[in-house]
Amino acid sequence: GHQVPLIVSKGSGLPDGGGIRRQYQHVTDLLPTILDLVGVEMATTKGGRPVPAPAGASFTASMSDVSTASTHPEQYYEQMGHRGMYRDGWSAVVCRKARTPFSEEVWELHDLVEDPTESRNLADVYPEKVAELVEAWERAAWANQVFPLDEGNNVKNLLRPPWNADTEAEAR
């Protein structure tokens, strides 16, 4: 979901005594935020090999200022063929129907600012926004080795095993 609570205590470091923050952040933002809070730099090498930079961004600034913009304006999702793209308050999603060609699936569009429960599909009202988000999802999917899509039947790993030589070079 897009509204998952997170409780953070920063001691007396919050000028307004805490409160609710509504900026979009993602689970990938937790490591950079924790490192930022404790003042530790991310390692750049391990065992002589480069360590990939974390995908997220620290959101410590929003802890001190409720009006700070999100440090994570967009995020793609994919799990077992279900897909989604979040960008600046908009969410495009498609829920996978088993044994249905991926090309026949219909994306939904939701305005998370006005409709955080995603109860109103606005795809017919804003088709250009759907096209924009689907295109952004496809770019992110290609850049992050999401293809080929599968339905959770592990076909992807049969075609590209996770233990192949390309992944062995990175420090884990």
Model-derived features: where do they sit?
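Histidine-centered active-site microenvironments of extracellular/periplasmic hydrolases
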Residues: 1-14, 26, 168-169
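Active-site-proximal N-terminal segment of extracellular/periplasmic enzymes that hydrolyze or transfer
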Residues: 120-128
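Intrinsically disordered, low-complexity polar regions and short flexible loop motifs
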Residues: 115
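Extracellular/periplasmic ectodomains of large secreted or surface enzymes and adhesion receptors
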Residues: 131, 156-172
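Active-site proximal loops enriched in glycine and acidic residues that flank catalytic Cys/His/Asp
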Residues: 8-10, 94-96, 126
